[in-house]
Amino acid sequence: MAQKRFLLNEQDIPTQWYNIQADMPTKPLPPLNPATREPMKAEDLAEIFSMECSRQELDCEHAWIDIPEEVLDMYKYYRSTPLVRAYALEKALDTPAHIYFKNESVNPLGSHKVNSAIPQCYYCKKEGVTNVTTETGAGQWGAALSYAAKVFGLEAAVYQVKISMQQKPYRSLIMRTFGAMVEGSPSMSTRAGKDIVTRDPTHPGSLGTAISEAIELARTTPNCKYTLGSVLNHVALHQTIIGLEAEKQMEMAGEYPDKVIACFGGGSNFGGITFPFMRHNILEGKQTEFIAAEPNSCPKLTRGKFEYDFGDEAGYTPLLPMYTLGHDFKPANIHAGGLRYHGAGVIVSQLLKDGYMCGMDIPQLESFEAGILFSRTEGIIPAPESCNAIAAAVREAKKAKETGKQDVILFCLSGHGLIDMTAYDTYINGDLRNYTLSDEDIERNLGTLPQV
């Protein structure tokens, strides 16, 4: 019988993260101080982030960053995660393509997010921090951060996007189980939240609003740092453990991917699975395709603009060079809450601009159709976010059937959907719908970009 699952021995788990910035021909533009418009140094970023994460954020010299022993010890509780050949999905699609998925749903709390939550909390603890704050959409990051904070003895406060909190009530319960304070965003507990609610009392919340509130709380709480679940360079760095493992596992399978796919919100799991493979395109001229699957209701990669913008709605973050829909963009109430973000990470934005990858926009109904197919063939109910990656993989597998090519397709299953069943209920009952943005809506939002 052909092998289906590929696992690494504990001694083969990577001991370094891969920093693609060091190998990029065109380095990412620096973050700017929003007041002075001057490039920021690590010391400036460390006002809200841990010092070590701030250094990693701006490091364009070192391609390999050692994983601290304490972090590696925590990783070994659940890593490596399986690389799985999706034979049943291939059969259902009647495709010559070979489809593999990296199963991050088996991680603690059910997603890839813990891969960065652990090192971020470790660095905070090492630097004497006692409190951490963060934002979360669907709750995967908030749950992971709450868990990691408890492991390292930190107090955690989480602002969860209000509409996602309503759609997925058990995620906030998970966070509270680990001792975190959880509040829906926009809230009335911060100045940023009050301003947003005053302007729009029915605002459903966005990752941009939640980030504003989490940063404000971090700035006003003694001995507190802000942690982020995506977008920033150091988060993608930590997530490269995914792709580095997958490289070794694909070698065990005797194949190399022609296409690598992940869903896209801010870029953490996309960068995690793709960057280790992308370095071979950059350094060796390989021709692997890298596809970021984003919801077509939040199309920053496919319809956004490459400009400096804030990472949050209130304008508390540094100005970041990114593909953006505008920091005050109010996304539709889609169920892939982790993808409802206006901008793309700095590294991914530069790589897209330079042609190393592409975006693919996926309608919500198509994503759930693919998620149901995957559930019924592979026996795993995927997170709504991951459904976008599956939908993109299905498109590519169908394309392989048309051309007769035996493409090797690898995608990241970033999380399971067992706490997202209300979304599946809505889809199965026929009540789910697609959302689209008009060109006028996008242009109106882009009209509010800061002048740099």
Task: Describe the function of each predicted region.
Residues 124-163, 256-269, 290, 385, ...:
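A short, small-residue-rich loop immediately preceding and capping a beta-strand
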Residues 114-118, 134-152, 166-169, 264-274, ...:
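Short glycine/serine/threonine-rich phosphate/pyrophosphate-binding segments
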Residues 141-204, 300-313, 421-429:
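Active-site-proximal loop->helix
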Residues 103-114, 132-142, 232-235, 261-266, ...:
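Active-site nucleophile and cofactor-binding loops and adjacent substrate-binding regions
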Residues 264-272, 364-429:
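Claisen-condensing/thiolase-fold acyl-transfer catalytic domains that form or cleave C-C bonds
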Residues 2-129:
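Positively charged, low-complexity intrinsically disordered leader regions
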Residues 64-66, 196-234, 242, 279-287, ...:
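Active-site/ligand-binding loops adjacent to catalytic centers
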Residues 119-129, 143-155, 176-177, 274-284, ...:
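Alpha-helix C-terminal capping segments
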